[in-house]
A protein has these predicted regions:
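Transmembrane alpha-helices of multi-pass inner-membrane enzymes
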Residues: 174-226
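Long extracytoplasmic/lumenal interhelical loops at the membrane interface
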Residues: 73-92, 96-135, 158-159
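Transmembrane helix irregularities
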Residues: 5-12, 132-135, 186-187
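Hydrophobic core segments of transmembrane alpha-helices in multi-pass, intramembrane catalytic enzymes
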Residues: 14-26, 143, 196-205
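Hydrophobic transmembrane alpha-helices and their immediate junctions
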Residues: 24, 36, 137-182
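Hydrophobic alpha-helical segments of polytopic membrane proteins
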Residues: 1-56
Length: 226
């Protein structure tokens, strides 16, 4: 809750979206169908923060923020703070010449720093764009397969122990952390500049697996969900 509130107060759109997604998956994994009201409340909070918290609305829609309402939001253009322009330039220079293999590890970031040697945009602000431009379709597809595998792996293990309260909570937390991390990677450089955020889901996954071992060995008392 405090993380979500801090994201709103600081007008961090990526943080708001990641919090909503992560908490929603946590509730759904932990409470199953009973989590639907909580998820709906989170969605309502997201919509409310976008339309009724002025700093968030200004950052989301830029100069047109005053004219954007719920009824005409479909026609509004979301402000990307220069990201869209930068991504197009990177894709044209580093991806389009060789879509299969990309420009090579470090190629896109190195090129961006070279053309902005006097300051300006020096971060790609998207791990997904960076992977696609530097590793091409092959590298991106391999990572997407890894991301999907990790999510389904944790979900499958969580479902197997769905009657255990502690394991279900840990599994839901791990799923939410992975989903939030992969979401943030779309709009920021999590892997290269916020490595703590990237490592956290894997730490939770390790704790989750170790807790399963301890539970099966009888070192933790199994608390059954009624």
């Amino acid at each position: 809750g405090l993380l979500f509130l801090s994201s709103i107060l600081e007008s961090v759109r990526t943080g708001i979206g990641a919090s909503i997604l992560g908490l929603s998956l946590l509730f759904l994994a932990y409470k199953k169908g009973r989590a639907v009201p909580a998820v709906m409340l989170l969605i309502a909070l997201f919509v409310g923060s976008v339309f009724f918290v002025k700093p968030v609305k200004d950052k989301m829609f830029g100069k047109q923020a005053e004219t954007v309402t719920i009824s005409n939001v479909g026609k509004a253009k979301i402000e990307t703070s220069g990201r869209e322009y930068m991504w197009k330039r990177i894709m044209n220079h580093c991806y389009n010449p060789n879509p299969t293999f990309g420009s090579g590890c470090g190629g896109a970031l190195g090129w961006l720093k070279d053309i902005n040697s006097k300051g300006g945009l020096v971060l790609i602000h998207s791990d997904w764009v960076q992977m696609m431009s530097e590793s091409g379709n092959i590298g991106l597809c391999l990572y997407i397969l890894f991301a999907v595998f990790m999510l389904f792996k944790v979900l499958a293990i969580t479902w197997r122990y769905r009657n255990n309260k502690m394991l279900t909570l840990l599994g839901g937390t791990t799923v939410g952390a992975f989903a939030a991390c992969f979401f943030c990677m779309g709009f920021d450089n999590v892997i290269t500049y916020a490595q703590q955020g990237y490592v956290l889901p894997f730490m939770l996954f390790g704790i989750f697996l170790k807790t399963i071992d301890l539970t099966e060995n009888g070192e933790f008392e199994e608390e059954i969900i009624p």
